[in-house]
Amino acid sequence: SETDSRKEGRMGQKNAVIRQWCENDCNYAPK
C-alpha cells in the first residue's frame, strides 16, 4: 500500500544514517 511504501522509505533513510554512524561506532550498525 502507499502507507507501507512511505514506511519503508523512512526505514531506508534511517538505515542509511545508521550505516553512516557505523563509520564511527559499529555498535549502531544494523545486524
From Swiss-Prot:
Tissue: Expressed by the venom gland.
PTM field: Contains one or more disulfide bonds.
Lineage of the organism: Eukaryota, Metazoa, Ecdysozoa, Arthropoda, Myriapoda
Gene Ontology CC, one term: extracellular region
Alphabetically ordered keywords of this record: Disulfide bond, Neurotoxin, Secreted, Toxin
Subcellular localization: Secreted
UniProt source species: Scolopendra viridicornis nigra
Family named by the database record: Belongs to the scolopendra toxin 1 family.
Keyword Disulfide bond: yes
Domain of life: Eukaryota
Main location: secreted
Keyword Disulfide bond part of the UniProt annotation: yes
Record protein name field: Scolopendra 4610.56 Da toxin
